[in-house]
Amino acid sequence: MAEEKKETMEEPKIGVYVCHCGVNIGGVVDVEAVRDYAAKLPNVVIAKDYKYYCSDPGQLEIQKDIKELGINRVVVAACSPRLHEPTFRRCVEEAGLNQFLFEFANIREHDSWVHMDNPEGATEKAKDLVRMAVAKARLLEPLEASKVSVDDKALVIGGGVAGIQAALDLADMGFKTYMVEKRPSISGRMGQLDKTFPTLDCSMCILAPKMVDVGKHDNIELITYAEVKEVDGYIGNFKVKIEKKPRYIDEELCTGCGSCVEVCPIEMPNYFDEGIGMTKAVYIPFPQAVPLCATIDKDYCIECMLCDEVCERGAVKHDQEPEEIEIEVGTIIVATGYDAYDPTEKLEYGYGRHTNVITGLELERMINASGPTDGKVLKPSDGEKPKRVAFIHCVGSRDEQIGKPYCSRVCCMYIMKNAQLIKDKMPDTEVTLYYMDIRAFGKGFEEFYKRSQEKYGIKFIRGRPAEVIENPDLTLTVRSEDTLLGKVTEYDYDMVVLGVGLVPPEGAETLRQTIGLSKSADGFLMEAHPKLRPVDTLTDGVYLAGVAQGPKDIPDAVAQASGAAARAAIPMVKGEVEIEPIIAVTDSDVCGGCEVCIELCPFGAISIEEGHANVNVALCKGCGTCVAACPSGAMDQQHFKTEQIMAQIEAALNEPASK
């Protein structure tokens, strides 16, 4: 246990510790010269250097000086605070010093790494950075973290394979978990697939048992055909409003017998079959649906009441209204999945105009035995089997012209999978793949790629097709450059399949703004750190899973979902979280209540109470936007107070180590 905190209102006694970081700093900067310079600065009682201060011996040396020399401020000149600031905060706290009486001078990323060709200049800059850190350290104040309690319930948004895995993991840990899915049944995109690559396992055979587990789990409350409309609060204490759309069927009474579907006279496009098949105005999405309950689409229903007449349980409720549900949870996992890219804007490929041009997901539903063609691959134009099929890779991916420069990571593999399945069903069919590069990066992927060539005889042409032309007989001519042969080719096909990429789902932007999340350049939700916090977000208590965070295959989505569940469980297990005190504070005597800070705060952490700004300590991230914008100077930021920053600036400008 840390020793009793030392009194810090006395005269500052500063210790400066300059790290070599092996040769990262020591190979460029004259560390000994920086150490000697620091020793002469006001209030510095000890200055030392060491090869690695982040190591145990280095930290023990700092702790020894705190205890024996009475040091009450510590400055470490080393690497990025992003990496080791928590390390040194713990170090000084274990020695009895408040952790916020520590200051970091970054002389690696800000100095040695960017001035490797100028050691002398780098050394002088290091002196400047250390002097600035010492100037701020003199004015540091002890701060104490606050704690907030955490509700031990969780919310999972999205009912695809990632959301299912996350919900089951949390529920198995004993936490009450709400799952919200916008469609009538959980399953996500995985439920639409026939087989999964590279093992060609039955997709629904893998997924359906997990779906059933979700529906039956005592700790999971499943809310389908619903969307999150409002999220207020902060980690441990989120208040969520959910709008549940009317099914016009009572979920508690419906047994999924299908009698209503049989008698319904109205047909409509089946969303689950990507619109290439038909269903009824009252429908059950697919046989394994969870919950197994019918839904009436009022856009098509003519209210003939035949469904009501045949329902023995009286489950049909034509007067059902939308329902607003309010829940309180401690943590949230966003697993909203993806949509397939709509290739209509790729006019050169003729999707939506050329009858026999379809997407990869539409082909998935054709191949599926429970799909609209009972597993037969048929040309949309005449219902006959195609003798020549072409696949075009990277439609909606790796294409800067349409603002989609990223790789969708699954297209190469799902195209080869479907090509193999076509050959299995129709061995005499000629299959050709037009590709830019084959990205077979996962376990078993390269072998899968080779099998496509060697066992199935699938033809590969390297090049992005320029145009797909529809001929009078509805065959299709694909004009493309073959970059390996260095010539333009034109081949005729009966059907062309577009390997469409993955894009953020409809409604993702609204949900992002509702929760207050960031997004990456490609539109997917952004993690807090790509390597160190890959499932966290910048909003504490909110985590990401699956393709919501970026394109990935099923194993990666499941692994990330389990990781997100584990991260979400940590604060709920503890029962409370510590809130760092580096936040904005308001001088109520100066604040005029102009609300400029409220408009600019990216985290919604400020409100007006009793005529002046009030900062919610749990929501504030200490970004300083309000401090910079406040016209009256009423806002300040702990640990980065105006006087502390000004002291650094004055130290940099008034006493430069070199001119």
Curated annotation (Swiss-Prot):
InterPro entries: 4Fe4S_Fe-S-bd, 4Fe4S_Fe_S_CS, AlaDH/PNT_NAD(H)-bd, FAD/NAD-bd_sf, FAD/NAD-binding_dom, HdrA-like. It catalyses: coenzyme B + coenzyme M + 2 reduced [2Fe-2S]-[ferredoxin] + 2 H(+) = coenzyme M-coenzyme B heterodisulfide + 2 H2 + 2 oxidized [2Fe-2S]-[ferredoxin]. Residues 244-274, 292-321, 581-610, 611-640 form the 4Fe-4S ferredoxin-type domain. The keyword Plastid does not apply. Its cofactor is [4Fe-4S] cluster; FAD. Keywords: 4Fe-4S, FAD, Flavoprotein, Iron, Iron-sulfur, Metal-binding, Methanogenesis, Oxidoreductase, Repeat. FAD binds at residues 158-181. [4Fe-4S] cluster 4 binds at C601, C620, C623, C626. Pathway: Cofactor metabolism; coenzyme M-coenzyme B heterodisulfide reduction; coenzyme B and coenzyme M from coenzyme M-coenzyme B heterodisulfide: step 1/1. It is an enzyme of class 1 (oxidoreductase). Binds 4 [4Fe-4S] clusters per subunit. One of its GO terms (molecular function) is CoB--CoM heterodisulfide reductase activity. It comes from the Archaea. GO terms for biological process: methanogenesis. [4Fe-4S] cluster 3 binds at C591, C594, C597, C630. Pfam families: AlaDh_PNT_C, Fer4, Fer4_10, Pyr_redox_2. [4Fe-4S] cluster 1 binds at C254, C257, C260, C311. [4Fe-4S] cluster 2 binds at C264, C301, C304, C307. Its EC number is 1.8.98.5. The heterodisulfide reductase is composed of three subunits; HdrA, HdrB and HdrC. It forms a complex with the F420-non-reducing hydrogenase (Mvh), which provides the reducing equivalents to the heterodisulfide reductase. Part of a complex that catalyzes the reversible reduction of CoM-S-S-CoB to the thiol-coenzymes H-S-CoM (coenzyme M) and H-S-CoB (coenzyme B). Belongs to the HdrA family. This is H(2):CoB-CoM heterodisulfide,ferredoxin reductase subunit A.
